[in-house]
Regions:
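PLP-dependent aminotransferase class I/II
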Residues: 1-145
């Protein structure tokens, strides 16, 4: 496979490059709004590494009963992503190595979901996503109780 960039792709990306930092800053602001809305609740956002500055290409959360939550949110017009459904130790390149039990990785792979994230996501949109997400997760908790 040849994955080199052609001249047109290079020109487009070169034109976008000056905006990269402002887009990353906007994504960090959106992530901060998510963190504010979801703090202390049943939805856990993946933590930033201390001393780092996250680019927030994705905003990954851990939720119980992920597949039902995704279906319910989709019915409400909120699309989510599933970017890491298989833990690393279960992926093809690692199958030849010693098999180990990694229950935390297995659990995380079953709970993680990518929430809507783009630089210009409005405060009202973040609020709606968080409210619907919390309602959905809390409804599942009350069904179990």
């Amino acid at each position: 496979m040849n994955s080199r960039m052609d001249a047109l792709q290079a020109a487009v990306l070169l034109a976008k490059l000056p905006r990269l930092e402002s887009w990353a800053a906007a994504r960090r602001a959106v992530a901060a709004r998510y963190r504010s809305h979801l703090a202390g609740g049943p939805v856990r956002l993946v933590a930033d590494a201390p001393g780092s500055e996250h680019g927030y290409h994705l905003l990954v959360a851990r939720v119980p009963d992920r597949d039902r939550v995704r279906r319910t949110l989709a019915q409400d017009g909120i699309e989510t992503g599933l970017h890491y459904p298989v833990p690393c130790h279960r992926q093809v390149p690692y199958r030849g190595y010693a098999s180990v039990d990694l229950p935390v990785a297995e659990q995380a792979a079953g709970e993680i979901v990518s929430l809507p994230m783009f630089p210009h996501l409005a405060t009202e949109q973040v609020t709606r996503v968080c409210e619907q997400l919390l309602e959905c997760v809390e409804a599942a908790d009350s069904d179990v109780a």
